Each structure stands twice: as structure tokens, then as C-alpha cells.
Amino acid sequence: MGRRKKGRAVSGWIVIDKPAGLSSNAVVGKVRWAFDAQKAGHAGTLDPEATGVLAIALGEATKTVPFVTDALKAYEFTVRLGQATNTDDGEGEVTETSDARPSDDEIRAALPPFEGDILQVPPQFSAVKIDGERAYARARAGQEMEIAARPLYVDSLTFIARPDPDHVTLEMVCGKGGYVRSIARDLGRALGCFGHVKSLRRTWSGPFELSDATPLETLEDLAKDPALDAHLMPLETGLADLPELPCTPEGAARMRNGNPGMVRASDAEYGETAWASYNGTAVAVGTYRAGELHPTRVFQHGAL
């Protein structure tokens, strides 16, 4: 018999407005401790100095993390023009400078090439692996390396404000795997003046918004208090981008055992990923085929 996991079998989502100076994993650790949860994980890393929406899943909700990770996310960020750094943000050393400053119209005109399906080279200081080692570890050791470009979908890149000649604030909505620091670096080069990220805030991630966020201070004040559970959002929130297929009690029982189960008529396409529900409660995620859901993830969070 396997060893019982420590902590409570609590399930759901909580959104934290991550403060600057903490890693995403450090915030996950604080959340897991505060809820005394058996399991916790986040749906998309934020750099330590970045702030904003960090969606964290507890318990059975961790099975829905991939669907939030795959969803679009929005970032508001300020680019410092005229300086390149070795980290592509304000934490690194300045490596190149320029006195050139583009006009607002020149900046707007430079944005469209960064939209749509693009190829992006991650920063030297990033978590991508090069020959089995994290790029940032090699960069800290003074090694320069070539990092292969990676595909990224950018839904939009929008001019927001120009606080002063040295700074421009933009909003980017993109898919998973994007580095805002790389956008700032490459935009600066395209403008002929260099650039790096001065500040970065994630404003939404899939179904989760800043208005859903719990301040870290509240989390710490209510740690181990049952009242903290009131801040949890349902597991089903992480499935918002997938079709919901209501099922019968018999279908739910079959899916709970890992077998295909009957679902009621829906608009889901044959072969589409969807989730089955019974009385609004998620039963399983899987592939829809001819009136049945073939489960790939089954939720065990209470009787149906």
C-alpha cells in the first residue's frame, strides 16, 4: 500500500497577484502551505520580478493545468528604450546603448511583424534546456550559447502609452511559451535603438483575471484557517475553454472507472477534447467520439 500523502485533499483554483521578488514556485509553496494541501501547481511561470496573475491549482484541479497553460495570456509591460542588457530586463548588465529614440508612429509601425505565428529566440537567461542544462545556469557561468528559435503565437501587440522618450508601454496577448523579454529585445533592435523590459505584469491568463486575485497578505493572514477555502474557485474553472458535455449517472460511473461513457447531445466535434459533467461537477476530460467521451483524465472529488 502506498504512503498516504501529507495534507488535506483540497481541490480548486486560486489566483494570486504575484508580487515582485518572488519566484512562481515560491508562491506555489506558500499557497500549498497555507491550505495544507496535498498537491499544488501553477499554470504558467512568471519571472521573479514580474507581477500579476499567477493561477495555482490544488488537488484534483492540477489535472486541468495543461488546459490553462495552453490558453491565451495577456501582459502589460514597459520597454526601456536605448539600452540592451544581458538578461533582457532591468536586472542585468547593460551591454549596448543608443541615443536614437523612435517616434510613437515608428513604434506602432514596428509592432505588426511581431503578431501572428512568429519565431522567437528565448533570452540567454531563461529556463530552456541546452544539452540538458538550464540556459540561465550556463549564462551565469559566463558561457555564451546559441538558443534555437521557438514558435510563438501572438494574438496582438498593442501600443498603450509613451510615458517619456525612454519608455513605451505595450500589451501583448499570446499563447504559451512566450518570452516578453525577447519581444522587448527584438523590438528594440527593429527600432534601431535597443531595448529591455523595465516592468512586466500579467493581467489575465485563460479564464483567470486580476479581479479574481487574492493578495498574498490575505493568504498568509488566513493560513491554516478553514475560511481560506472561500477564496478557492471551482476545479471546473480550469476547463472553461473546453466544451462541456453533460452525462448520465451511468455514463459518469463508467468514466470514473476509465471507460468511455455516454454524454448528451452537444456541439462538440468528433475527436475534440471536451469534459463531461454531472450536475455541473467535472467527471472526466477526454476525447469526444460518437456520443461518448473517452476519458484521459478522471476526477475523484466527491460522490456523484
UniProtKB/Swiss-Prot annotation:
It catalyses: uridine(55) in tRNA = pseudouridine(55) in tRNA. InterPro entries: PsdUridine_synth_cat_dom_sf (IPR020103), PsdUridine_synth_N (IPR002501), tRNA_psdUridine_synth_TruB (IPR014780), TruB_C (IPR032819). It holds the Pfam family TruB_N. Residues 85-105 are annotated as: Disordered. Keywords: Isomerase, tRNA processing. Gene3D superfamilies: Pseudouridine synthase. GO terms for molecular function: RNA binding; tRNA pseudouridine(55) synthase activity. The active site is at residue 47. Belongs to the pseudouridine synthase TruB family. Type 1 subfamily. Responsible for synthesis of pseudouridine from uracil-55 in the psi GC loop of transfer RNAs. This is tRNA pseudouridine synthase B.
